[in-house]
Amino acid sequence: MRPKSITRCEGNGMAENTEIRWEYDVVEVGQTGPKLTIEVTEELIATYAKAVRNPNPDYYPPESCELERLVKLAMPTMIFRVAPLRRPDIAANNGFTALEKASENPRQTPFSKCEVRWHAPIQSGDSITSFGHILSKEERRGNKFVTFRVEATNQNDEKVAEYDYTCVFEYGKGQNTRES
């Protein structure tokens, strides 16, 4: 099935395709997004801790130099900050427009589940490089699911974590839809 594309007429009367929607039928296992590198600093750790309302003083700047540790560990959930999913980037890297970014009839691909595996701690001074790719597609009870995997390594090319993120790309007939 050919994906839906949006066609617009330019001022010269010529039609131009501006986007091809990343619908379930054109999502392919193995499609990959670009790599992203984020530097982990003590400030980034503290900002994240504040944003998620974690009061643990280990994540904040020390009160005095005597208390300062050589390295600050990041909380495990910070993996989502330093190695974000970036679905629209995966779509764009493969020539498509993510459904939530489509210019006409945009829609979400709702979260279904997430499973994280940690391999090494993330700490201040690390450079975390991550990328996402399509791990699997499946249909269950008429619903169509896509599972993404994000893999993250540090500056020593040591895997620090990976997570699988599954979302509903299409609901089965008669199930929760925008039209219902």
Where are these regions (language model features)?
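Short, Lys/Arg-enriched N-terminal segments with co-localized hydrophobic residues
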Residues: 2-13
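HotDog/MaoC-like acyl-thioester-processing domains
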Residues: 13-28, 111-113, 117-180
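Hot-dog-fold acyl-thioester-processing enzymes
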Residues: 15-111, 174-180
